[in-house]
């Protein structure tokens, strides 16, 4: 018996032309790399918005859609396959190498997204007894999932319903399971997944953070694209900002929202509960037709549309729900391990959201704990990097299996006081200001 499989037969000596694909299969964006398997170098990289977004910007909306009709699960699968087709075509055009003929593709994604890819019932991930249809699909031929890909797909296994292959992949990149120090790994975006531990033990947990952190809330919330406000500063009552591509603003993305909220709190435009103070600035206006206050962060004269861009009280309240969920996940996993915030030696933050956001602003509003800043390390895409590690080093497959066997998973849905803790975390940064001493010293 052998674990080797012939995927293709080519004429001549093709050993110098040996390529593979690494994929970060995200709920919002999918990234694919073409990798030279001889050198390990990246030949090309492409990313596109996941075509599944037409069925919902967040995973729960897509699951609801899939349950409405038996054919809808196939709609989601076809949308995924179409996204992969776009990436294969883009890589081929950019590099001149036919990406669809690569012998292997490593796919790193969360458990729900893998169910969408395979056309499986994703509701099993969220519903008791939390038993996914498949947590370890292993190797599949591209044609088995309907892809115009001639090689084998290897889908990185999940540790649980919420701890998917993207987190397992990230652990291979960070090597937390080999470290003496206690490390926390937080991959945050539409969902939040955490792992806490070291070489002796590991505890993992996850939950839905919602699309707010990536900008998908509010009337003018948007993904990080040209025209999106990505940085905000308030000084002497005046708002300044930058936009992606230096264009006139058309909306605000996740990093801009964090800056805006942090700056409004530090300048007393909002109070601890996130309520706007109409006396704090003439930029805080009352919307008669909506019966609520809003902060104008770009005037009609400044914006691309000719209309003012504003963040309403409703927008703030929705965002605080999301940030509270993120912080409470961290709090619960620390308690599960009997570890205090001070005992965390390293905190790795992964995902597009933390990579492009200001850490100080995120701590100011209470998304992350008030740890010494040197303990934080931003890692742009551990899911993709871990997939590439597996692609170029098959010996680490066995290491990954051992890692999975030694990980204990926490179900946040089963934490009895999770919602009570969330209520305290809905404040900026928290009801217990002593947990945020550096922010307490700065708030006016």
Q: What does each model-identified segment do?
A:
Residues 1-116, 124-126, 444:
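N-terminal glycine/serine-rich phosphate-binding loop of ATP-dependent small-molecule kinases
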Residues 18, 191-192:
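Short, surface-exposed beta-edge/turn micro-motifs
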Residues 62-71, 75-95, 104, 113-187, ...:
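Helical "lid/coupling" subdomains associated with nucleotide-phosphate turnover
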């Amino acid at each position: 018996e052998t674990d080797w499989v012939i995927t293709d037969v080519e004429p001549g000596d093709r050993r110098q032309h040996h390529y593979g694909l690494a994929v970060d299969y995200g709920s919002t964006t999918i990234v694919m790399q073409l990798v030279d398997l001889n050198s390990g170098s990246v030949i090309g990289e492409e990313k596109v918005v996941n075509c599944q977004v037409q069925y919902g910007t967040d995973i729960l909306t897509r699951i609801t859609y899939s349950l409405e009709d038996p054919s809808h699960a196939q709609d989601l699968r076809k949308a995924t396959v179409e996204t992969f087709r776009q990436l294969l075509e883009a890589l081929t055009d950019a590099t001149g190498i036919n990406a669809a003929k690569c012998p292997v593709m490593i796919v790193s994604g969360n458990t729900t997204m893998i169910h969408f890819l395979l056309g499986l019932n994703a509701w099993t991930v969220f519903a008791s007894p939390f038993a996914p249809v498949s947590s370890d699909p292993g190797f599949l031929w591209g044609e088995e999932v309907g892809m115009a890909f001639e090689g084998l797909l290897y889908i990185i296994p999940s540790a649980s319903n919420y701890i998917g292959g993207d987190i397992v992949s990230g652990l291979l990149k960070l090597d937390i399971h080999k470290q003496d120090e206690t490390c926390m790994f937080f991959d945050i975006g539409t969902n939040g997944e955490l792992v806490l531990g070291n070489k002796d033990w590991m505890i993992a947990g996850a939950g839905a953070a919602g699309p707010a952190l990536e900008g998908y809330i509010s009337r003018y919330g948007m993904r990080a694209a040209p025209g999106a406000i990505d940085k905000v500063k308030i000084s002497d009552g005046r708002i300044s900002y930058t936009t992606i591509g230096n264009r006139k603003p058309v909306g605000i993305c996740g990093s801009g929202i964090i800056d805006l909220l942090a700056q409004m709190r530090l300048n007393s435009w909002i109070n601890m509960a996130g309520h706007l103070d109409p006396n704090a600035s003439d930029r805080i206006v009352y919307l008669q037709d909506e019966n609520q206050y809003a902060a104008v962060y770009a005037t009609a004269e400044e914006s691309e549309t000719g209309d003012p861009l504003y963040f309403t009280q409703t927008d703030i309240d929705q965002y605080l729900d999301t940030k509270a969920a993120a912080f409470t996940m961290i709090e619960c996993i620390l308690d599960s391990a009997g570890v205090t915030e001070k005992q965390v030696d390293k905190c790795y933050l992964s995902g597009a959201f933390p990579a492009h956001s200001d850490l100080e602003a995120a701590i100011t509003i209470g998304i992350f704990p008030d740890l010494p800043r040197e303990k934080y390390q931003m890692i742009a895409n551990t899911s993709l990097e871990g997939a590439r590690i597996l692609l170029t080093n098959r010996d680490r497959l066995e290491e990954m299996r051992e890692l999975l066997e030694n990980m204990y998973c926490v179900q946040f849905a089963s934490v009895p006081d999770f919602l009570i803790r969330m209520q305290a975390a809905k404040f900026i940064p928290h009801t217990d200001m002593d947990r945020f001493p550096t922010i307490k010293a700065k708030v006016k």
